[in-house]
């Protein structure tokens, strides 16, 4: 069985950042535990330019890891002068996606206009390079979809990661050719409506993720998340979709390689 964690932040695990030897030992443990749970590949998602450099330096020896390059909406103010550097870095062959980008009105409504500017620029770069975008949207789905449509984002496609929105929003995204990715939130007891939405998502547009080290699934909720826990998320999604775990693994793996135009 072959699972892919389509969104994680391996560099942000709760590990010793000051000792390089210990750092690599801890990463080895994290990845080996994931391998034991059939998680074979990982897309580690950058949240800032500084984060991208750090991640690439830290993880460059691991063939199982793919990279994205982007500036998270909450870091736009901090990296206000970095859009040109983002574009330059995005040409790197190791970068398979732009992001994560998008809008976050929950934590930073006051930077709404700046977030929108950065979001649009990510989309334009993605279209130019023919690379998908990874979208973060919190309390902002209406504006997120509006901008995607205005910027013709169907030309690059991408993922709405850690999806928690309505069925209506899901199908607006699907109509533009986007993929929908579900995280550990789908295992939470209160996620009844989200489970009902998942039932209606076409299998060919479905992806799975941990968003490690955040959003650990049940039975690990409250602990630091890690890619190994993708197996628990996959089991829950397979149950909801009424298919076998092996079938879900095959479908989501194929979807990942299709979206990012990668060879298996």
UniProtKB/Swiss-Prot annotation:
Q: What is its EC number?
A: 3.1.-.-
Q: How is the cofactor bound?
A: Binds 2 divalent metal cations per subunit.
The protein's GO terms of the molecular function aspect are: DNA nuclease activity; metal ion binding
Which cofactors does it use?
A: a divalent metal cation
**Classification via InterPro entries:** DNase_TatD-rel_CS, Metal_Hydrolase, TatD-like, TatD/YcfH-like
Extract the SUPFAM superfamilies matched here. Metallo-dependent hydrolases
Matching PROSITE patterns, A to Z? TATD_1, TATD_3
Listed GO CC annotations: cytosol
Q: Where does a divalent metal cation 1 bind?
A: 7, 9, 100, 211
* Pfam families in UniProt: TatD_DNase (PF01026)
State the source organism's domain of life. Bacteria
- Record keywords: Hydrolase, Metal-binding
Q: Which residues bind a divalent metal cation 2?
A: 100, 136, 161
Protein family per UniProt: Belongs to the metallo-dependent hydrolases superfamily. TatD-type hydrolase family.
Task: Name the chain's protein.
Answer: Uncharacterized metal-dependent hydrolase BUsg_343
From what organism does this protein derive?
Answer: Buchnera aphidicola subsp. Schizaphis graminum (strain Sg)
């Amino acid at each position: 069985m072959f699972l892919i964690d389509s969104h994680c932040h391996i560099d942000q695990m709760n590990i010793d950042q000051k000792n390089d030897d210990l750092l690599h030992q801890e990463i080895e443990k994290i990845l080996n535990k994931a391998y034991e749970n059939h998680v074979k590949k990982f897309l580690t998602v950058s949240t800032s330019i500084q984060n991208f450099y750090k991640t690439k330096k830290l993880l460059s020896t691991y063939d199982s890891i793919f990279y994205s390059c982007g500036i998270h909406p909450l870091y736009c103010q901090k990296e206000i002068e970095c859009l040109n550097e983002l574009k330059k870095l995005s040409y790197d062959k190791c970068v398979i996606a732009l992001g994560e980008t998008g809008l976050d009105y929950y934590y930073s409504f006051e930077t709404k206009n700046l977030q929108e500017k950065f979001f649009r620029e990510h989309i334009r770069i993605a279209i130019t390079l023919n690379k998908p975008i990874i979208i973060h949207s919190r309390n902002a789905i209406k504006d997120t979809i509006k901008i995607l449509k205005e910027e013709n984002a169907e030309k690059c496609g991408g993922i709405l990661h850690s999806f928690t929105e309505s069925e209506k929003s899901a199908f607006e995204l699907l109509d533009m050719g986007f993929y929908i990715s579900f995280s550990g939130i789908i295992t939470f007891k209160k996620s009844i409506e989200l489970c009902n939405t998942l039932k209606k998502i076409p299998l060919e547009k479905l992806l799975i993720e941990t968003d490690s080290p955040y959003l650990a699934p049940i039975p690990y909720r409250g602990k630091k998340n890690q890619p190994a826990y993708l197996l628990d998320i996959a089991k829950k999604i397979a149950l909801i979709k009424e298919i076998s775990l092996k079938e879900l693994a095959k479908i989501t793996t194929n979807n990942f390689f299709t979206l990012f135009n990668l060879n298996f």
